[in-house]
Amino acid sequence: MKDLLKFLKAQTKTEEFDAIKIALASPDMIRSWSFGEVKKPETINYRTFKPERDGLFCARIFGPVKDYECLCGKYKRLKHRGVICEKCGVEVTQTKVRRERMGHIELASPTAHIWFLKSLPSRIGLLLDMPLRDIERVLYFESYVVIEGGMTNLERQQILTEEQYLDALEEFGDEFDAKMGAEAIQALLKSMDLEQECEQLREELNETNSETKRKKLTKRIKLLEAFVQSGNKPEWMILTVLPVLPPDLRPLVPLDGGRFATSDLNDLYRRVINRNNRLKRLLDLAAPDIIVRNEKRMLQEAVDALLDNGRRGRAITGSNKRPLKSLADMIKGKQGRFRQNLLGKRVDYSGRSVITVGPYLRLHQCGLPKKMALELFKPFIYGKLELRGLATTIKAAKKMVEREXAVVWDILDEVIREHPVLLNRAPTLHRLGIQAFEPVLIEGKAIQLHPLVCAAYNADFDGDQMAVHVPLTLEAQLEARALMMSTNNILSPANGEPIIVPSQDVVLGLYYMTRDCVNAKGEGMVLTGPKEAERLYRSGLASLHARVKVRITEYEKDANGELXAKTSLXDTTVGRAILWMIVPKGLPYTIVNQALGKKAISKMLNTCYRILGLKPTVIFADQIMYTGFAYAARSGASVGIDDMVIPEKKHEIISEAEAEVAEIQEQFQSGLVTAGERYNKVIDIWAAANDRVSKAMMDNLQTETVINRDGQEEKQVSFNSIYMMADSGARGSAAQIRQLAGMRGLMAKPDGSIIETPITANFREGLNVLQYFISTHGARKGLADTALKTANSGYLTRRLVDVAQDLVVTEDDCGTHEGIMMTPVIEGGDVKEPLRDRVLGRVTAEDVLKPGTADILVPRNTLLHEQWCDLLEENSVDAVKVRSVVSCDTDFGVCAHCYGRDLARGHIINKGEAIGVIAAQSIGEPGTQLTMRTFHIGGAASRAAAESSIQVKNKGSIKLSNVKSVVNSSGKLVITSRNTELKLIDEFGRTKESYKVPYGAVLAKGDGEQVAGGETVANWDPHTMPVITEVSGFVRFTDMIDGQTITRQTDELTGLSSLVVLDSAERTAGGKDLRPALKIVDAQGNDVLIPGTDMPAQYFLPGKAIVQLEDGVQISSGDTLARIPQESGGTKDITGGLPRVADLFEARRPKEPAILAEISGIVSFGKETKGKRRLVITPVDGSDPYEEMIPKWRQLNVFEGERVERGDVISDGPEAPHDILRLRGVHAVTRYIVNEVQDVYRLQGVKINDKHIEVIVRQMLRKATIVNAGSSDFLEGEQVEYSRVKIANRELEANGKVGATYSRDLLGITKASLATESFISAASFQETTRVLTEAAVAGKRDELRGLKENVIVGRLIPAGTGYAYHQDRMRRRAAGEAPAAPQVTAEDASASLAELLNAGLGGSDNE
């Protein structure tokens, strides 16, 4: 017995490991894995079904087919364990060794491994520095390659055709050595001296100047060094021995009817063995060269197909014309080993069923059908029955449960009590898609779900199904209860707002309950308290909506956190007083003293959580729900067709619009407007008409006139059911009501363009055939879009998770002083997001000072919670520098201070939290709500773009930033800088509005002046760009020669003449090199200098510029010298929605990106080429000027002689994130990506916290390119993990050496995932072959840092509750202790023993 226990212990031991290394296998290594050579292609004997000897399933090589039994049956039973049968040669052992024992095939001729040959860049090609085409010609026996030139004029690695080879043979005899096939390549690889080659290349690298050559050399050096360091030998890329997969991993399964289903691998192996054996025979017979060669080529192709079918030439197909699945196909793709079996395992103990509503459940409960619970909790019931002595054996217990005896139900009740179960709804888009509940047994067959958690699951009850999982171990139950219980997940991890919010009926009920109504029964009473209000309502003496006075007792927390009561008489309604009874103590009465809509209820729950904490909030949420349901039922709100009131004015509005359209049509026919303008105008007219109709309709629905107590008419908010549903936020929106009772409006074609005839009818009037047909267009597009959107959104989430999966909070504080400035998001006149929303839950990076003083308001390293934010608002701070994950200094991971508050819990984040995955889920989950289409902005929107003035909305004072300006003759400011911003500051010093002011705008008010709301503060001409003079004086033309550089035009209407500068293409030969300009001189004819510089005021004019001055006229500063017409951009497509988010995270370059200044300096233009002009920026300090060629059609924002700063926009367009990173730095690119992504989500009304996007940006900035290696081991131009460079530099600086300089790289998320340090994670993501090839050649080690790698190797993840386990492992490793031996308990031992004996008895026990 003791012996047996020891044996059992040995069976369960797993190796502790820290890292996984991948490398090339040497032939000796393959032989050492192998248990014997497979010599025959046979599989099993068709009569006896026993494996053939030496075949692909041979029992002698791979092990016995039955447990502890040899093939011929001489030795059976456990007692012969380890004996090798002398008759059949099979070792007596467990049959599971057939899953792990490998065989091998000795190849008669070496063959190249296709991965190292064909996976680009070809490793063999790179190593030998030969083109892939040549290597292929050698390998597939079309050409010879010279291996040793000897004394001849043949070079090593020279390719010879058959004829050339024969000629050379005649000429030189056997002085040289040339071969073909894999042997030749093997010989070349073998004879390479890697170290020497490396030295030589490094020397070449230092000498060469050409960029392409440098790149090529660096690539080769990296590969050679990888070989040297990893200990791989180049010749191992050529196979001489082929390993054979264990047979149980490529099984042969008998189907009924005597046929067999086989794995494709067996076919592929059979081909290889057949060809190999044939080749051996041919070599023994010394067959003619050409036959042997053909056989060798066929063997090479067979091995190729086995390793990666279809990579070269046509894929080998099986009997049914389907390509065979090779070894490479087994591991890659969605159905491959990684994604199907390692990352997507199935879970035991689960049931699934349809869900229904459980309106009487508490928040932490779910209803579980009895039948289901009985099945799921079987093991626990068996155990309990035995423990109570109600059943003697498991088998008896099983019988009792099957009989469903009465005692079983009692025991089920006991077992289930306090045992949480997990509920999951697919698709699980974020972590709230799986939550734990305590089961309540119910009759019926459907799971009951608490209505408030539906939002988190995105569940509805139209037939959705959910899965139930039972956590078995104590630890699992603990985690489910402490972390996953629905009551612990009240806030959404994406934005920190409550996600347990009432919706639909509950909202409608509460809204109905808290509305007031004029002259309702009982109006004007004074009540002693909510109890009396309820009594009066129940006894029918007062209406729910009656306006009354009630004595209310509020409780408020004082400084010590004690509750202090305060009683007052409040004007309120009966319904609100009744609702007050369920509000927990500590909240103010004002919270319910209003008509409660969805937003207000959400805010109420949020306030409750922040003030009172978790428990009262959960109880409150449940009470809200019960009350809401009760009063929604009492309200009797229902929808009738008469509720959709069509406004009387609708008819006249539509006829007015039709008249306007007819007028435009006439103008078009008489040629006054173009077709495009007509289309845009028509659409604008209809859009405006639609708005007017819907406004009339909403005004109509919104109010009703009633008689009050004094007999006068009074308007009040209407009790129309449809309006109440929309107003409360329960269901529907103004846009939907507009289609019911207004007009349906303009419809879009499937390509996104708008049909110019709108649907003037609404659903109440009904649609005619044409209108109905137009509607189907849009409806179908909606469905098609949804299907596409789901797939795209899922793929985006997958990429995001993959790039961020290894980011975990690993330390408390990294101590950095870096951070990003947070300012409110202001677009035009609206504050889109106030500062408090942006900084809430972040940690300050430096002290926040009270504006205008040196007093510290908030010290650095403070977590800004609600109270701090109130303080910031009171002092109207408008910029705070906060810590950010992008600037965090932790090496592998992030520190808690840089991340800030854990949004789902409301306190600073814990160590071990997997913030990367949370960020990815938070961004990906709303993905399906984003739109798919690109917006064709025509009509209304493009007109808004051509603004010509700024009109402020609020009163306040003006503040200008980055401004250069001159004062013109009428005393107004004229802007002469490019990126001026105008902000409106209110009396508290808060920024309310912000606008961009273009060059040449005339300001009505100066910096710091007061303005009133609605005042126009700036004007400009949107269609031309002016050239403004900064000095006063007289105009002097230079190089303005009529007919050569300029031409005179006269306007027919006004009779004024103007000069137009010719484009250099249109000029005569003499005018090509002239540069027309306007110079400003004083009365004596001397140059006037631009103030503050020593440059003469001379303005060069680009082509097409229009000058309306004559030579010698007097002008004053701020006047317009010339105008450059701007082509209006036409209707540009604006990528919106999901594709835009994907573009940003993939860091794709836009089509025509903005051109930014690479350095600071003075702009001038050099010699032009045919289609481009040469822009030269000369630095002020006299270093080398920077030149760039810019296509002629790009509009430039800068004039000659202007000063630009690095990163300024030279030509407008969408900015490329890579340029922003290079020229303006990490913080600028973070800000850009965060703001752009937020714009898309904000448009859809989705709230996501900035830090999630920052987390992804941090991962995109993970790599750096070495600019100068210093004393480090890096190569120039090499791309390295940013943290690696930091660590290396730290060590070098500690030793007083020079560190490497580097530039940060921005990689798209796909690129970044594939470029991670972990090859396991990258291989399981995409491009498996390429990743594994690269890793094997470099002999990479995977340190198993991320979550994915650990899941794949089957360990706890180093995050969450697994974080402690990994910390403990690290600590023990550092202390050098052995891991604690797994203790085998008596139960384990007896269980394994029973299993063993059962197996040994040949499975006679068939219960």
Curated annotation (Swiss-Prot):
Protein name per UniProt: DNA-directed RNA polymerase subunit beta'
UniProt xrefs under InterPro entries: DNA-dir_RpoC_beta_prime (IPR045867), DNA-dir_RpoC_beta_prime_bact (IPR012754), RNA_pol_asu (IPR000722), RNA_pol_N (IPR006592), RNA_pol_Rpb1_1 (IPR007080), RNA_pol_Rpb1_3 (IPR007066), RNA_pol_Rpb1_3_sf (IPR042102), RNA_pol_Rpb1_4 (IPR007083)
Reactions that this protein is recorded to catalyse: RNA(n) + a ribonucleoside 5'-triphosphate = RNA(n+1) + diphosphate
UniProt: Mg(2+) binding residues: 460, 462, 464
Essential cofactor(s): Mg(2+); Zn(2+)
Pfam families documented for this protein: RNA_pol_Rpb1_1, RNA_pol_Rpb1_2, RNA_pol_Rpb1_3, RNA_pol_Rpb1_4, RNA_pol_Rpb1_5
Example GO BP: DNA-templated transcription
Modified sites of kind N6-acetyllysine: 972
SUPFAM superfamilies: beta and beta-prime subunits of DNA dependent RNA-polymerase
GO molecular function, one term: magnesium ion binding
Sequence positions that bind Zn(2+) 1: 70, 72, 85, 88
Function field: DNA-dependent RNA polymerase catalyzes the transcription of DNA into RNA using the four ribonucleoside triphosphates as substrates.
Family: Belongs to the RNA polymerase beta' chain family.
Alphabetized Gene3D superfamilies for the sequence: 1.10.132.30, 1.10.150.390, 1.10.1790.20, 1.10.40.90, 2.40.40.20, 2.40.50.100, RNA polymerase II, clamp domain, RNA polymerase Rpb1, domain 3
Record-listed Zn(2+) 2 binding positions: 814, 888, 895, 898
EC number(s) on file: 2.7.7.6
Keyword list, A-Z: Acetylation, DNA-directed RNA polymerase, Magnesium, Metal-binding, Nucleotidyltransferase, Transcription, Transferase, Zinc
